[in-house]
């Protein structure tokens, strides 16, 4: 039987929500092994004038505990 754990990560990017999600996984993988899935819980962005300047994600990362 596998035991799974979920952590919540906030990340941002100046390119896209997808890039912010990739950054969250990359950063988490520095200390967490056996990542199985990512659930994008929330997306938001900041705006400067008439332009989006930061894409933000709140993700839940699931990994297997050995």
What annotation goes with each model-predicted range?
Residues 2-37:
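Short, well-ordered alpha-helical segments
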Residues 36-38, 65-66:
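Short, surface-exposed, polar/charged, turn-prone segments marking secondary-structure boundaries
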Residues 44-66:
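A cross-kingdom feature marking charged/low-complexity
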